[in-house]
Amino acid sequence: MNRFSLPRPDARQCVAGLGFSALLLLASSANAAACRAITSVQQSADATRNTSMGGHVTQHIYGMTPPSGSSQKDKTLFKSRGNYDAAWRQYGYIDNPVACSGNSKFQVVSLEKLHMGKIDAYSCKQADGQGVCTRWDTYMAKEISYGFVLKDGKWILNTLYPVPLD
């Protein structure tokens, strides 16, 4: 060994270092909170507050105006605000909610796991000048998609929409 080289770690030190690194990784992912439990997410799940908090759930609820500059055209929509509220409420009861970490998280949940019956939904074909759907096809949803994003330092419910049967 010369004055510029470092001593090489033995196998036990390498294994110990890898084990410690794995433990840190597990601990950090275990500490991530379920998105649905975060106060700012719960606040943003209120469709009337969502747009002002940076989300776009109103882009997926028939009868509500989407955020400025967006449209419901070519989007899937809940048939009513009540269907949207039910989809969010039922997400509170699933046993495997996504944990918020990084910058965004997404989860698709079947209606069966949400303990919801079949729900009618719309596929928007045309919208007015404000982006509100004016012509649609009706379909039966099979799943609900939940999208969470870190916005201005706070987690929010960014999107929530029905997924059609194939």
Task: Enumerate the predicted regions with their spans.
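N-terminal secretory signal peptides that target proteins for export/translocation
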Residues: 1-10
